[in-house]
Amino acid sequence: MTPTRTIGLAGLLASTVLTAPALAWAQDAAPSAPTPQDPEAVSTVEDIVVRGRFVPDVKRETSAVANILTEEDIKRSGDSEIGEALARVTGLSIVGDGYVYVRGLGDRYSSIVLDGSTLPSPEPLKRVVPLDLFPTSLVSNAQIQKTYSAQYPGEFGGGLIALSTRAIPNERFLSFGASISAETESTGKEGLYWDAGGKLSNIGIADNSLNLPNFIKIDPSLKSFANNPAMLQGAGRSLRNIWSIDGDKNLPDFGFNLSGAEIIDLSNGIRLGGFVAADYDYQVRNREGVRNSFEVNGGVNDQISPGACDSAGGLSNATGCGFQRTEQEYALNALGAFGIEFNENHELKLTTLLLRKTRQQALIERGLFSADPGLIRSFQRLNWIEQQMNSNQLSGRHVFMLPMALDRLQVDWRAAYSTASRDTPYRREYSYRLEPDNVFRMTPGSDSNRTFFSALEDENTEFGLDFTLNGMIADREITLKAGGLHQERERDFASRRYSFQPAAGVIISPELRSFVPEIIFSPDNIGGDAGYTLRDITDPSDFFDATMEINAAYVSAEVEVIRDLRVTAGVRYEDSEQQVNSFIPLGETGAGDPIAANLAQDFWLPTATATWEFADNMQLRFGYSKTINRPDLRELSNALFLDDDSNTLERGNPNLKIAEIQNYDLRWEWYFGQRQSATIGLFYKSFDNPIERTYQPIGEGFGRSFQNAQEATLKGVEAEIDYTLPMDVWAPNLTWFQDNEVFVVANVTWSDSEVTDAAYTRALQGQSEWLGNLQFGFENPTARRRATLLVNYQGERISDAGIITGSTRLPDVVETPPILLDLVASQTFTVGGRDYDVGAKIENILGEEYERSQSFANGGKGVVEGYKLGTTFSLSLSTTF
């Protein structure tokens, strides 16, 4: 991205944020003059000054620096996933498949709770659940808290996102919706496909044919088959002989959602209710671009780009260099909430949430690889990934009126059990190379073909209890809180790798290697003296198990110290233990030996926030807190994982420490109308032992790992405006302008960070200097129409921090996110006495590209990964019965 473009967009967002409050002030400050026809207006009366709280939205009522995302906000943006909707919030950015960055900090510094309970992640490489799993139809609101409160988990860095599922409504209904969309780089274009088999694979449900065959389950290590050729032959032939990738036209994206509620009013104020919702979505995306890896000095290791084919000496088959990937995504989600209320003071609620996503991937990379210098190589991968998260929570709320000054006691309790899983029942990789006679042949080395099976299971059990006591003491409002938490988490991962390799003494002919894999690995060529034998090439570090236990307690108080000054202070105590068991990888000293990581530590975490209402509808907040950031269980294991999106290997670090963070916040807030506000805030954070994702040598190439830097700081400014103006102010005599309103929602965040790591400094990994959002549109509640133009900007950020290896530091990998320009419109029609909501949306109007790159000491720059993002056109229809 050019500096001019960055500065221009940042200036646009900043000017919108700073000038809109002036317009609002002018509108507020211009009351109509009294007229003679209004006798009361010209009467002389005594001056009466009334001071009171005008609280137009929930954001002001909170005791913390926070933003609230409501159902109305989601309707304005037209977002289908909660991650997309959160990207519109001040200081938030969404990276990859729904991972939230708050104030430019990486997803590791973000916490997510659902109805008060933490959630496990179905991603082995991530510590938090991806928000693209959550359709907006299942979420009622989201509170984004940027200052820490003692009732929440102590792992807090950038912010906490508290999601709430839809509550039991006040009336019964049945709602249905459908959508269809097309993306310019994918829909109707040729995609890459392979036969997953099974009757339900077209909706993302695989049959047993993708699982590890029963024959191999007898002994997955194959060790007992070593002296039994017949058993070894049977094991090889039991694997599915599906390898090839074919081309076919991509379908458009589509989706359906259904929700309904039932209410039953019983006698004596007892009320039963239930809410259910289900959502299904299908999406297919093509990605075509370049991938490269570089040496420290900028020399090329792997070149997967069109330029690689130019170096093939004029061979006619040296075409199509670069990478191509097609991913089909099937999402099936369901929510059930059932509750009972007793006289409005007591409530029991059972909530069950199921989020399931399946991805079928086909990848072809063609170019120059360091494993075959000077030869064009074609690498292909078939991948099937099933992710699922299931959360079950039983909760209660009980209110008791007490005969004392603090006269209202509320008791909230919850018991939650959640599971997350990620299964890769079938992943195949194989390589061909273009040899000097212009023929592609399967590579002869041990890496010519591999078949993987892996499974990850994550269980989370949590019990929470909270007490809230409200009342008046000495004519001052006071709220006391206390509570506790017990959480247990277990994670298990297991993987198996297999490869067909030539039997002892067998040389595979060049002619056989020139055929497709289905012929090369046909049953006739497996076992005995035929050619290939199945080998187990599993690494000892492909297995790990981990546990974590947290016990916590907190107390806090919110007190009106003097008139217009509220102070909230508290402290949380957390005691935790993390245990990870794995093995030393092959190729390293002590390969196969067990290795354990144990982190046991306790913390006192103080927090305080002061809110001063120094003027009508204005207030100033100051906040301080101490928080922590633990390594994830995955990050403490040295097991190797493959990042399917970037095709990069990743390994944890058993020597990681817990990071400690000091947080300071100052924010001015002005509420000048219903759902209208302006804010300007300053923030500062200091880190001890911050955990950073690094780019470093792994095996024969480069990959990702984690390490503690020495210290880091982050400072920044954020501003926000939410402003609505009736259009008839501009043209009161034009009928079309009647009842129409123009709204502007804009925010901008500038932040600067510095990490001290060994002998050099840099920005925090994942932190963007500039973030900005702009929503400009109009709506007519009477005509039930609305249109919104949305802009989302995220500045460059370090994707992977380079580390010092020997006497040289590897260059950082820098990510350049696209500028996203979207247009959303909706209209409600009445047909046959029923309302129908019709929506249209255009996403990524600019057709931006995605890029990650490295800059070298000699002034050169290399693209690590780059591809074009298409423009998406969507239509939706929904109705309620």
Regions found by a protein language model. Give the residues of each.
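N-terminal plug
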Residues: 38-40, 48-96, 101-104, 114, ...
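Surface-exposed extracellular loop regions of Gram-negative outer-membrane beta-barrel proteins
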Residues: 117-118, 360, 365, 421-423, ...
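Transmembrane beta-barrel wall of Gram-negative outer-membrane proteins
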Residues: 217-363, 388-390, 606-609
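Outer-membrane beta-barrel signature, preferentially recognizing the C-terminal barrel domain
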Residues: 374-395, 538-551, 599, 617, ...
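Gram-negative outer-membrane beta-barrel transporters
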Residues: 677, 682-687, 703-801, 878
